[in-house]
């Protein structure tokens, strides 16, 4: 696979984890799992088999730049990006992609949050590698989802269409934003 670049989104304030997470020191920088590593450090650790830290980019709030430098000291300073303004996910991704495109016009880009809970790291790496292999020679975007085990109203759902030429990779019919409980139950039943 060629020129893999990874964007790690780390700008949120983690208000749902208060009082552990505060606006000055949000959850992505805290050892919430009790393993001696913060969530962002665990994210970098599980991505290292995919690409080197030199090819990872963190997009964060200006006031968290120092924390990122402390927690990921081997990341190039130029790869730690301060969002000009907190505008949520899409502008964060666009900003980082623009920076990457200037240095790596043919990059195969992964976007991930800094605070995802990943239990089965080897399966995550396998799926991510498969997605990168698929996108390496196509003009395609792959989104990775997990099959829900129960109806959940706090997350969006991916409605899968037909299988592509690659096993486990489906075309997306639609993204269904956070549904009410009745709709979530219908998604689980289908």
Model-found features: residue ranges?
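Short alpha-helical oligomerization interface
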Residues: 24-30
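Structural signal for conserved beta-strand scaffold positions within catalytic alpha/beta enzyme cores
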Residues: 31, 82, 174-177
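Conserved N-terminal catalytic core of the sugar/cofactor nucleotidyltransferase
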Residues: 1-8, 16-19, 23, 34-113, ...
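Conserved core of the sugar-phosphate nucleotidyltransferase
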Residues: 121-190
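Short glycine- and Lys/Arg-enriched binding-loop motifs that mark or flank ligand-binding interfaces
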Residues: 7-10, 150-152
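Conserved beta-strand scaffold positions in the cores of enzyme catalytic domains, especially
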Residues: 29, 80, 141-143
């Amino acid at each position: 696979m060629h020129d893999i670049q990874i964007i790690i989104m780390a700008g949120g304030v983690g208000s749902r984890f208060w009082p552990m997470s505060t606006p000055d020191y949000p959850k992505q920088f805290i050892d919430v799992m009790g393993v001696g590593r913060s969530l962002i450090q665990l994210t970098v650790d599980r991505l290292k088999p995919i690409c080197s830290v030199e090819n990872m980019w963190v997009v964060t709030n200006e006031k968290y730049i120092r924390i990122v430098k402390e927690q990921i000291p081997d990341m190039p300073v130029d790869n730690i990006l301060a969002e000009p303004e907190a505008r949520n996910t899409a502008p964060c991704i666009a900003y980082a992609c623009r920076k990457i495109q200037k240095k790596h016009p043919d990059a195969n880009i992964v976007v991930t949050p800094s605070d995802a809970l990943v239990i089965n790291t080897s399966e995550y790496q396998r799926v991510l590698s498969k997605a990168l292999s698929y996108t390496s020679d196509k003009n395609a975007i792959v989104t990775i989802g997990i099959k829900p085990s129960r109806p959940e109203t706090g997350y969006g759902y991916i409605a899968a269409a037909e299988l592509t030429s690659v096993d486990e990779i489906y075309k997306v019919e639609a993204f269904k934003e956070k549904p009410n409980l009745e709709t979530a139950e219908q998604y689980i039943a289908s």
